[in-house]
Every structure is written in structure tokens, then in C-alpha cells.
Amino acid sequence: MGRKFQNKKKKAAPQLEIVPLDENPPLPPQRSSDDVVPKKARKEKWVNKQRVLVFSARGISHRDRHLMKDIKTLMPHHRPESKMERSKTLSVVNEMCEMKHCNKAMLFEGRRKRDLYMWISNTSGSTGPSAKFLIENIHTMAELKMTGNCLRGSRPLLSFDSKFDELPHLKLLKELFVQTYSVPNHHPKSQPFVDHVFTFTYLDKRIWFRNFQILSEDGGLSEVGPRYVMNPVKIFDGSFTGKTIWENPDYVSPSKQRQVLKKAAKDKYVNRVEQKVKHEATRPIRAYDGMDNDELFEDDDPVETAKILAAIAKKKKEEAAKQTPKSALTKKIKEKQLQAVKDVIERKKARTIKRVKKV
């Protein structure tokens, strides 16, 4: 039995024809956004390896922390980091990014548990630039409860206002936003399709950020959140350091605004006290001043009242006679003006006669 099995020859495997694959197959004329992406497209190379370090310094409020959490959910290419101590300077952020292999940084810095500042910087080689913003009108996703919804990790479209192509400092900020907020293509943590859009609108010398879900291919949108306003403060040449390239001339710090409001409230109290003192000083002793015809009501005799009225009428008539009427005054003024014109004409005639005699 063993010999029989040993003598059996192995069958030769059938040879398969090698057909060259077309690397760039023709695409259909129309594709729907709901179509499933084939697996081959998912295995393409991840070239743009942008990584953003998103973290905060100690001293931010709960709402600021929730905003930072929302931004992290919208940016799958972010890297987390624990809170930075207050004793450390901003130049340490470049070293932290180098340790985490990040080339962009987004730092949230709180002041007095009220004000929130955001830094966006290009930390690759500490070349910069970096921009500082004051964050205003913060509304998180949980607070808004909008009807829009987008898949976690999907790539967004970035929409910019037309003014971002006109002003030079906005051109720089646009490029910084594009490199920070946009999710790299074929990122391992990203979904291979686009279903929401980030809008950056320049209005009232501030940048308004909104996040919308793309409902349909014809442009239907529904807001998702979060929403906040970035008031640009300064743009620096380096990463968290360097010369100031641009500074906002219209920027007023929140502490200065609160100081002005407190001063206005204090002035309101001082004005009220001054008005009270002035009212007490100028308050009349008598309830009313005397009338012109008080004498009429002192006596009930009608004869005496008639005499008083006749005396008052006579007195008014005498005063009116003393005053010159307006018509007489205007007549005198016209006569004086005519006399002055005649004098001027006579002088000019005399001058012309003298000149003729000399000639």
C-alpha cells in the first residue's frame, strides 16, 4: 500500500493568465454621495500628515472646556494633551508639539474664569506664524441642540468669505485655518466622505465660525454646532514668539470694557446725588410766584376792582406810547441806508473828476 501511494504522481497546477489591471479605471458620469466607497480607495496612501495638538492652560471655565471638547470631536487629526501649568511659558508649547509629532497647535487660555483666548500656531520648526484670538459668544453643541447631525470623523468643506481674499492679514489667517481645521485625506481616524462644512465669515471686524450639515447635493444645510466668534488680537512672526506682524487697532480688552461699564455705573450714582443736592438748594420757599393781577382778588368791591383795572390799562397804554413802533424803526433804517449809498456815489464822482483834471 505504501508503494502505491509513493508511485502516484502529483497533478500539475493549472496556469492562470495574468491580466494587467487598469490603475485608473474610468469613473461614471454621475455619482451619488450615498454610494459606498470601495475598499481599494481606503487603502490609498496617507500623504498629508497634519497633526494638531489641542489642549488648554489651567484656568478655563466649564463652557470653554466643553467648546474644546466639541472642536476635538470635529477634528479627528488632533492629538490630546493634559493642561499646561501656569508657571510655564508659551515657548514650551513648541517642545510639546515636537514630542507629540504635531506641526500645528491650538491652545485655549483662560483669564479670570471669564475670558477665553485661543492661539493657533504653525509649530513645525518654530517658524510660525501664530495668531491670538479672543473667543466671544460661545455656544456648544449640547447647549444649542440643533437639528443638524454629521458623522464623527468625516471630512469637512471649508468655506471662506470673499473678504479673506482682499485683506492681507485675512489671507494669512485663511491659510492658517485651512492647514489647522481641514482633515487630511485618507487619515486613519477619518471617514472617507464629506458631509458637513465649516464657514468662516468676516463681519463687524470679527471672524464668525459655524458648522453646517450638508443635507442634499443642491446646497441644503442644517446647523450642527458649535458656534463662536473669533476677535483677532495679534499675529506674530514666530510660533508663540517673534515680532508682531499685525495688531488689531480696534481691539479693546474685556477687562477694559468692564472697567468702562463700572465707571458709567459709578457716574450714574454720583449724578443722582448731585441732582438731589441741587434740588434741595434750588427748591422755592413759596409754592407759587405772585400773579400780575393779585390785587383784583384782595377786595370783593366791584367798584374798586374796576378802578384797579382802569389803572392797569392806562399804565400799559403809557408804556406802549413810549416804545417806538417797528414800522417807524424800519423807516429810519431805510433812510440811513439810502443816505449812506448817496454819500458813496458822491465820493466816487469826486474821485473821477480829479483824475480827469490831472490828465
From Swiss-Prot:
<protein>
    <recommendedName>
        <fullName>Ribosome biogenesis protein BRX1 homolog</fullName>
    </recommendedName>
</protein>
<dbReference type="GO" id="GO:0019843">
    <property type="term" value="F:rRNA binding"/>
</dbReference>
<keyword id="KW-0690">Ribosome biogenesis</keyword>
<feature type="region of interest" description="Disordered">
    <location>
        <begin position="1"/>
        <end position="42"/>
    </location>
</feature>
<feature type="compositionally biased region" description="Basic residues">
    <location>
        <begin position="1"/>
        <end position="12"/>
    </location>
</feature>
<dbReference type="GO" id="GO:0005730">
    <property type="term" value="C:nucleolus"/>
</dbReference>
<dbReference type="GO" id="GO:0006364">
    <property type="term" value="P:rRNA processing"/>
</dbReference>
<comment type="similarity">
    <text>Belongs to the BRX1 family.</text>
</comment>
<keyword id="KW-0539">Nucleus</keyword>
<dbReference type="GO" id="GO:0000027">
    <property type="term" value="P:ribosomal large subunit assembly"/>
</dbReference>
<comment type="function">
    <text>Required for biogenesis of the 60S ribosomal subunit.</text>
</comment>
<feature type="domain" description="Brix">
    <location>
        <begin position="50"/>
        <end position="241"/>
    </location>
</feature>
<dbReference type="GO" id="GO:0003723">
    <property type="term" value="F:RNA binding"/>
</dbReference>
<dbReference type="InterPro" id="IPR007109">
    <property type="entry name" value="Brix"/>
</dbReference>
<dbReference type="Pfam" id="PF04427">
    <property type="entry name" value="Brix"/>
</dbReference>
<dbReference type="InterPro" id="IPR026532">
    <property type="entry name" value="BRX1"/>
</dbReference>
